[in-house]
Amino acid sequence: MSEAGHNLHALFPDHGPALHALKLGSSNFRQLAEEHHDLQSRIQRVEAGLAAVADDQLEDLKKRRLFTLDEIAALIAIEEEA
């Protein structure tokens, strides 16, 4: 499993079967998971002092990360209702 998949399993520990099904069957989910992973990596680099961005840019990255998590959570809910 990719690092992005491991990260999502840590964030949504009670939804493993839905995450697995979405990973296999939803290109939209895979795109969101990859975007979340990329955003998380960028934020971590900035917070560790390895990359520099303006404060407003960091806030935008964090907002985008939350948006992707909301979208992922919505897909999980739909998958679990099916």
Regions found by a protein language model. Name each.
Residues M1-A82:
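Extended, charge-rich alpha-helical interface modules
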